Amino acid sequence: MTEEKINPMQKVKIEKVVLNVGAIGDELDKGFRLLKLLSNGKPAKMKSKKRIPTLNVRPGLEVGAVVTLRKNFPELLKKLLIAENNTFRKKQVSENNFSFGIKEYIEIPGMEYQRDIGIMGLDVTVVFKRTGRRVGLRKIKRGKVSKRQRVSPSEIIKFMEENFQTKFIGK
């Protein structure tokens, strides 16, 4: 009958959900519209920093769109997880984050085919944190945050299984 008390500073939380589409030219505009439609947020276009001659990428060229959701994301996250059947590989989980890709946005429940967008996929990254992370990130009076405050892959898997009923397979 005695419940194990958890230190409130050790609780795992979701910090943000990042949706990303990588494309160039017209595909980038379609990806931009897709992210706007999915998230009801304002996507930002990403510019390349390095030259990659084999891909015809030069510095300053817009190569993708990204939107970060910090509030009101649990409903969208549940839909995105359902699109992948709530089953993931353990390799997709790393320290402090969990990433997966969706091949076609029409797999997401509630999303219908948009003729002006066509068929597109997107990448989803879920970033985790513990309370007190801001101490290491702030600009004034920055402090050190110990390694214990990082969220391990096993803790992420446990959190996702308890709160979102996901299954992780593999080693």
What is the predicted function of each stretch?
Residues 1-171:
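Ribosome-associated RNA-binding proteins
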